[in-house]
């Protein structure tokens, strides 16, 4: 894994999928993520070293750093994968949906992929357990919240583009996204802390929480012609 590798017909990507080298790199990365999360859960984030993670996968620590800049990055990688999948799902929601409908639909779609094991590098039960660890690890929680704030900005830009409004002049995309994210955090946190791994029930609870909001939040405020 640490030796230099060059592209050959057996390692080069093809139209039919990644080559052997890419598959090996992907497999090593996935193993590093899983072993890291399991070690974090077993002995605590602070007490787990990069050397221990690398040893569990039987690679040199420098291989770890070829994939991740830090323990913090590997710990939050599954969360980032879910966020990216959510953004991609939102981009293709039907144009006629209002912002909350679009974000809710994207959330359901991604949660379904996690539940069915279809989101690469994300194990649903392991992710839920890791989120409980994030909640009680100050350093990880601070970085998670920082990334969540960045995510809100990206979501707001997508919503503004969908609705045909200028994000610099119209606060509603940021407002709607903040409401959506707040509901998601409150509902999800309850699931994490009580160790509930039923993702279908989580989806239902999230929808119920959104439905309890004032009807005005669900109104269609698209600019005519957008």
UniProtKB/Swiss-Prot annotation:
Region Disordered: which residues?
Answer: 1-25
> For bias kind Polar residues, which ranges apply?
1-16
- The regions listed as transmembrane in this protein's record are none
| PROSITE patterns assigned | HTH_TETR_1, HTH_TETR_2
* Positions of the HTH tetR-type domain: 26-86
What is a GO molecular function of this protein? transcription cis-regulatory region binding
Identify this protein by name: HTH-type transcriptional regulator TcmR
Protein's gene: tcmR
């Amino acid at each position: 894994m640490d030796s230099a590798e060059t592209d050959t017909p057996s390692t080069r990507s093809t139209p039919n999928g990644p080559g052997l080298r890419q598959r090996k790199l992907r497999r090593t990365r996935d193993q590093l993520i899983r072993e890291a999360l399991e070690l974090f859960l077993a002995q605590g984030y602070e007490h787990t070293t990069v050397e221990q993670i690398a040893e569990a996968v039987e690679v040199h620590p420098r291989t770890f750093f070829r994939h991740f800049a830090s323990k913090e990055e590997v710990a939050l990688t599954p969360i980032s994968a879910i966020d990216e999948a959510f953004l991609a799902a939102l981009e293709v929601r039907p144009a006629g949906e209002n912002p909350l409908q679009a974000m809710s639909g994207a959330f359901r779609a991604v949660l379904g992929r996690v539940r069915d094991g279809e989101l690469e590098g994300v194990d649903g039960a392991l992710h839920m357990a890791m989120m409980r660890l994030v909640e009680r690890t100050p350093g990880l929680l601070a970085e998670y919240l920082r990334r969540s704030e960045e995510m809100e900005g990206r979501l707001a830009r997508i919503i503004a583009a969908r609705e045909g409004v200028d994000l610099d002049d119209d606060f509603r995309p940021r407002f709607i996204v903040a409401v959506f994210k707040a509901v998601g955090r409150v509902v999800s946190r309850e699931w994490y802390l009580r160790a509930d791994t039923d993702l279908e029930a989580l989806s239902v609870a999230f929808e119920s929480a959104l439905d309890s909001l004032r009807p005005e939040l669900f109104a269609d405020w698209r600019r005519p012609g957008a």
